[in-house]
């Protein structure tokens, strides 16, 4: 990691991460490992895997934190870490919910018709 470690994020309640590359690598790897348990045809798996792989590649290639923040386009690197933590949490929930499975019962006719 090139350059000095910043003293503050400038965001209330969001502490500076001393090892952002390591933290992001761990989070993105956990997300990708979890996605392997999803069916290959699941839309959530396809798109989340693609986005997460791209971000992980950027983390591996760019040692400078400021440049990495610009490449990831998610604000401060600490905000990106927070986003990755939330994505990991969502992936765990999606695995429980199994949205790729068929509905338990058919929806009522005209359920999505508007106006009624």
Swiss-Prot record:
Its main location: mitochondrion. Transmembrane segments: none annotated. It is a peripheral membrane protein. The modification N6-succinyllysine is found at residue 98. Signal peptide: none annotated. The keyword Electron transport applies. The modification N-acetylalanine is found at residue 2. GO terms for biological process: respiratory electron transport chain. The modification Phosphoserine is found at residue 89. InterPro entries: NDUFA5 (IPR006806). It is found in: Mitochondrion inner membrane. One of its GO terms (cellular component) is mitochondrial inner membrane. Keywords: Acetylation, Electron transport, Membrane, Mitochondrion, Mitochondrion inner membrane, Phosphoprotein, Respiratory chain, Transport. It holds the Pfam family ETC_C1_NDUFA5. The modification N6-acetyllysine is found at residues 30, 46, 60, 98. Complex I is composed of 45 different subunits. Belongs to the complex I NDUFA5 subunit family. PANTHER family: NADH DEHYDROGENASE [UBIQUINONE] 1 ALPHA SUBCOMPLEX SUBUNIT 5, NADH-UBIQUINONE OXIDOREDUCTASE 13 KD-B SUBUNIT. Accessory subunit of the mitochondrial membrane respiratory chain NADH dehydrogenase (Complex I), that is believed not to be involved in catalysis. Complex I functions in the transfer of electrons from NADH to the respiratory chain. The immediate electron acceptor for the enzyme is believed to be ubiquinone. This is NADH dehydrogenase [ubiquinone] 1 alpha subcomplex subunit 5. It comes from Rattus norvegicus (Rat). The lineage of its organism: Eukaryota, Metazoa, Chordata, Craniata, Vertebrata. The gene is Ndufa5.
